Amino acid sequence: MDMNTLLSLSWHLMVPEFIILGAAILLSICDLFFKLNHRYVALGAIAAVVLAIVSLITLYSEPAGDILNGSFVLDGFSKGFKTLLLGGAALILCTAMSDDKKNPIEDKGEYYYLFLMALLGAMFMASSVDFVTLFVGLELLSLSSYILVGIRKKNRASNEAAMKYVINGGIGTAITLFGMSYLYGITGSTNIVDMQKVFAGELASGIQLLLALAFLLLLVGLSFKIATVPFHMWAPDVYEGAATPVTAFLGTISKMAGFLLIIRLFLMVFASVSVQGDMQSLYGRMSIYIAVLASITMIIGNVVALKQYNVKRLFAYSGIAHAGYLLVPLVALSPFTMDSMWFYMLAYMLMNIGAFAIIHGLILQSNKENITIFTGLYKRSPFTAIVMTIFILSLAGIPGTAGFIGKINIFLGALHVEPAHYVLASIMMGTTVISFVYYFRILQQMFFRTGEVEEKIRLPLNIKIVMSFCAISIVILGIVPMIGYNFFYEYFPLMKDFFFLGNVVQ
């Protein structure tokens, strides 16, 4: 490829990725040679993410396009979910500026540029429509996350968590690759758009059997990534052992990236495969397995959370349950699937990052991770208690919060399709009621229990900014949800260019 051809490519589609990559390289070099104060590295990382958000906003009006021989696309889907990834990353980086003095991260500079590399991997996963770039993004996210979990090298729990994460992550990646290999063997291509063209024709029954096997392998492999039951056993230990901002990253950015990969692969590949003698697609036939996975994930996640008293383990099981909720719209495919998933991920990101920001601040004060860190919080810091209450009510799905809007839309979406998924909707409603018990236990600690220590709690300014922004956003989206939905419909036309990507970018 000559220089003129190289320069003629649509590199502007990758400007947000270039900004994150450049910042990670620049910060690593500066930290290596100049030994910068970690606060300057943190501010540099935050500035890079904000700049990437601005550059992405300038691309909102850009029509769907592709680069790198069609393996990287910028469509409504990638724009919408990259906005969430970058916004969540900025909030987590702001939270991470407050350090744990009693249990510090030794290599604080590495912490920030590894975070940026993990974010870059997640962004690549949002835009990739080729197995090669998908896998590069997945591994960039995974390898950086493994190191982030174990970056507190002198902490035994952190080392144990990193080891468990590496082993389980490696197993999940191997199974995912095995499933991808079947698709490559059947189609002779690693490009998802090319696969759609192959599957548009008639397929022999033996090929359909191999495709069903590939579906199951990919479902199992990616279930490790999003921590659904029974592939969730790593999550509680990893959440507990990692530094709190890393836990927030795993519970939001990493989980969202896993769902993006599931959506790309399953809805673009398997939904295009017709089953012989049936009007249903292969995805429609196999979605029963996703329904079973969603059901047991919602049940086990919420029931086991009832017995958790370590606050990070409690939120780990809460996250497992929410992964089950997010699988429901993938079973009950409807015109509302994409917007309900986007809004739910937005609400989930805000309430989780906000809650983890407060948890991080309380752990810094008490050096404990038990649920008793919330004891008497209303007397010690009324504002913090009220803000945490907003997050808890939103996680529980109480009306007036963004969490309620997200859950009710998924619930109604399950009933809107034909045939309606009454069992799945009933399980979702029942497990939501169960979640009230462990969520309201935190409220009980804050308002109705008296702690041994009565001194006032003063959280760092950066944590106050993060939790205030998240709380205000949750209330606004809960009262006027059309603000979020109108933004989604105006800038991210997913139904236009997601399912018909080959026609749009060519």
Curated annotation (Swiss-Prot):
Gene (name only): nuoN
Family: Belongs to the complex I subunit 2 family.
Protein name per the record: NADH-quinone oxidoreductase subunit N
Oligomer and partners: NDH-1 is composed of 14 different subunits. Subunits NuoA, H, J, K, L, M, N constitute the membrane sector of the complex.
Transport listed as a keyword: yes
Transmembrane segments: 14-34, 40-60, 72-92, 109-129, 131-151, 166-186, 209-229, 256-276, 286-306, 314-334, 343-363, 385-405, 420-440, 465-485
Species per Swiss-Prot/TrEMBL record: Bacillus anthracis
GO molecular function: NADH dehydrogenase (ubiquinone) activity; NADH:ubiquinone reductase (non-electrogenic) activity; quinone binding
Record field: catalytic activity: a quinone + NADH + 5 H(+)(in) = a quinol + NAD(+) + 4 H(+)(out)
Gene Ontology biological process terms, A to Z: ATP synthesis coupled electron transport
